[in-house]
């Protein structure tokens, strides 16, 4: 059987893992032909919550990202990638303009850029509650994106992963011996490697007397995200 997440799973994780949890966001995937005036193209839709900006390190170029008010009131607001704005609006300011997609009209409230490359900048973010409403008031979600508190470190992150997996298996009635069912991609291993690399690099840089350079390197360890699906 297919394991599905819904809004109640989000609340359950928040209620039971406050010790570890920094932020959490659902993610629902969709695709749509997005149109503005005479221009249109097919884009990837990601329906998320405001904390998704933190998890993805999305950089706002214009306007703003989603707010809790957008989620609560299921607003038809859209945050579009830099290349979406370039495709549809060219030199026109997209903020406050309306685009059509999936048979509905959406107000553009922000434009973002992403270091992940062109593919990430051809994405449209919308409130997850708005997409759920469009999809016949379903509360299903595809993935849950979580970040853990930096102070728990690598050991705490691994502990969090193990406890979260067991919690979700119990919640979804999956056998404890079932290696599948729940998939968690934990980048804590990347964090550990980055910290070890940064520590080694710090020793080298300190030895040659230019320790100030390390400040720009340690930033790579700021990847602390689980993907649960």
What residue ranges belong to the model's regions?
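Residue-level detector of beta-strand face positions
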Residues: 33, 96-100, 183
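Non-transmembrane, solvent-exposed regions of membrane trafficking/translocation machinery
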Residues: 67-69
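Peri-transmembrane interface segments
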Residues: 158-159, 175-209
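Intracellular coupling helices
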Residues: 209, 218-229
């Amino acid at each position: 059987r297919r394991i599905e997440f819904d809004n109640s799973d989000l609340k359950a994780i928040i209620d039971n893992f406050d010790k570890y949890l920094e932020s959490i966001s659902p993610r629902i995937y969709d695709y749509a032909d997005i149109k503005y005036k005479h221009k249109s193209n097919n884009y990837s839709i990601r329906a998320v919550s405001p904390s998704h900006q933190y998890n993805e390190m999305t950089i706002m170029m214009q306007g703003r990202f989603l707010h809790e008010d957008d989620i609560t009131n299921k607003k038809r607001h859209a945050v579009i990638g830099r290349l979406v704005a370039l495709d549809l609006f060219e030199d026109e300011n997209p903020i406050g303009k309306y685009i059509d997609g999936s048979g509905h009209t959406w107000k553009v409230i922000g434009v973002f850029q992403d270091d992940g490359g062109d593919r990430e900048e051809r994405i449209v973010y919308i409130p997850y509650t708005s997409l759920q409403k469009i999809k016949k008031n379903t509360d299903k979600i595809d993935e849950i994106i979580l970040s853990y508190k930096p102070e728990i470190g690598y050991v705490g992150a691994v502990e969090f992963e193990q406890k979260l997996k067991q919690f979700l298996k119990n919640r979804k009635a999956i056998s404890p011996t079932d290696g599948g069912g729940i998939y968690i991609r934990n980048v804590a291993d990347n964090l550990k490697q980055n910290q070890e690399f940064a520590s080694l690099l710090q020793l080298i840089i300190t030895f040659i007397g230019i320790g100030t350079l390390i400040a720009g390197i340690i930033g790579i360890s700021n990847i602390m995200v689980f993907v649960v699906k």
